[in-house]
C-alpha cells in the first residue's frame, strides 16, 4: 500500500508537469497561430494592394495603347494628307513648267517675229508709227507673264513651307509615338516586377512559416492549416480571375446587345419612315377618291337635272294644239284676265304635280320591271338547280340500287362459295378416309362414280361462280374507271378457265374409264400426269393393286390442292371487289350528303 501511495505521489507531479507543458505548448501554438494569421492577413492586404496596382497599371496601359492607336491614326491621316499635297504640288509644278515652257517658246517666237518686223519696219518708212504701239503691247504681255511667274513662285514657296511644317509635325508625332512605346515598355517592366514580387511574397509564405517556428515543423496540424491557407489563397486568386473573365464576357455581351439594339432601332426607324410614307400615300389617295366622288355626285346631279328638263320639254312638246286651243279660249277672256290668273296658276301647279306623278310612276314601273326580271332569273336558276338536284337524286338512287343488287349478288356468290368450300372439305375428308384395302372392295365403282359426280358438280359450281364474277367485273368496270386491276382479274379468270378445262378433260376421262364393267382395271389411273410416255401397256397392266391405289390417292390430293388454291384466289378477288364496291358506295353517299347540304344552304 505504501509503495502504491509513493508511486501515485511520484506520478502526480509528473502529470502536473506534463499538463503544464501541454498548456504551454497550446499557448505557444495559439500564439503562433495568431502570428501566422496576422502575417497572412498582412500578406493578403499586400496582395490586394498589388492587385489593385496591377489593375491600375493595366488600365493605364490600355489608355496609353488607345492613345498610341489614335496617334497612329493621326499619323496615317497626316501621311495621306502629305501624299495628297505632294501629288497636288507636283501636278501644279508640272502644269506650271508646261505653261512656262509654252510662254518661253511663245516669247521666243514673238521676239523673232518682232525682230523680223523691226527689220521690215526699218525698210519701210510707212510702218514706223506702228512700232511703238506693238512694242507697248508686247511689253504689257511680258509684264503680265512676269506677274504670273511671280505668283507661281509665291505659291511654290507657300507649298514648300507647308511641306516643311508637315515634315516637322510628322517628326513630332513619331517622337511622341516612340515616347509612348517607351512608357508602355516601362509599365510592362513595372508590371513584370510587381508580378515577380507577388510570386516572391507567395513563395515567402511557407519560408516565413518555417522560420517562425522551427521547432514545430513536425506537427501535422500546423502543416494542414498552412495547406488550407495556401489553397484558400489560390482559390481566391482563381475566383478573381474567373470574375474578371466573366466581367469581360458580360461587357462583350453588353456591347453586342447594344449593337443589336442600335440595329433594331435603325430598322424600326426605317419601318416607321416607310409607314409614314405609306400613310401619306393613303391619305393622298383617299383625298383623290373623295374629290372624284364629289365630282361624280355633282355630275350625276347635273345629269339628273338635264334629264328632268328634257322630260319636261318632251311632255310639253307633243301638245301644241291644246296650247293653241287654250290660247283661243283665253283670248276672248282678256278682260277677265286678273280673275283668271289665279286659276292659271292653280292649273300650272296641277300640271307640275301631274308631271311629277308621271315621272314617279315611270320610275316605279322601271323598278318593278327590273325586279320582275330579277325574280324571273332567280326562278329560272332555282328551277335549273332543282332539276339538277332531281337528276342527281335519280342518279344516286340508281347507283344505290345497282350497288344493292351487286351486294346481293356478292352475298349469293359468297354463300355459293361457302357451300363449294364445305363440299371440298367433305371430299377431302372422304379422300383421306380411303384405304388401299377398301379401295379394292366391290363397291369401288359406286364410290368413284359418286366422286366423279361430286367433282362435276364442283366444276359446274366453279364455272357458274366464274360467270358471276365476270358479270360483277363488268358492272364494276361500268361504275369504276380503274381498268388495270380488272384487266389483271380477267387474265386470271381466263387462266383459271384454261386450268379448269384441262382438269375437266382429265376428270371426264377418269369418269368414262370408271364406268367400264371391270372395277379393278388399271386404266382409270393412266392419266396424262401419272403415266409417263416411256411406259408401255404391258407394264401398266402388270402394276399391283397397292401401287394403283397409291397413285390414285396422289392424283386426288393433287386435284384437291389445286381446287383449294383456286378457291383461295377466288376468295381474294371477291374480297377486293367487295372492298372496291364499299369504297364506291361511301364515295357516292358522301357526294349525296354534300349535295343535300349545299342545296339546304
Curated annotation (Swiss-Prot):
One of its GO terms (cellular component) is cytoplasm. Residues 305-329 are annotated as: Disordered. GO terms for molecular function: identical protein binding. GO terms for biological process: cell projection organization; de novo centriole assembly involved in multi-ciliated epithelial cell differentiation; multi-ciliated epithelial cell differentiation. The keyword Nucleotide-binding does not apply. The modification Phosphoserine is found at residue 544. Keywords: Cilium biogenesis/degradation, Coiled coil, Cytoplasm, Phosphoprotein. Highly enriched in multicilia-abundant tissues (trachea and oviduct). It is found in: Cytoplasm. Residues 14-59, 86-196, 226-277, 354-397, 555-586 form a coiled coil. Interacts with CEP152; the interaction is mutually exclusive with CEP63. Key structural component of the deuterosome, a structure that promotes de novo centriole amplification in multiciliated cells. Deuterosome-mediated centriole amplification occurs in terminally differentiated multiciliated cells and can generate more than 100 centrioles. Probably sufficient for the specification and formation of the deuterosome inner core. Interacts with CEP152 and recruits PLK4 to activate centriole biogenesis. CEP63 and DEUP1 paralogs are both involved in centriole amplification: while CEP63 mediates mother-centriole-dependent centriole duplication, DEUP1 mediates de novo centriole amplification in multiciliated cells. Belongs to the CEP63 family. This is Deuterosome assembly protein 1. It comes from Mus musculus (Mouse).
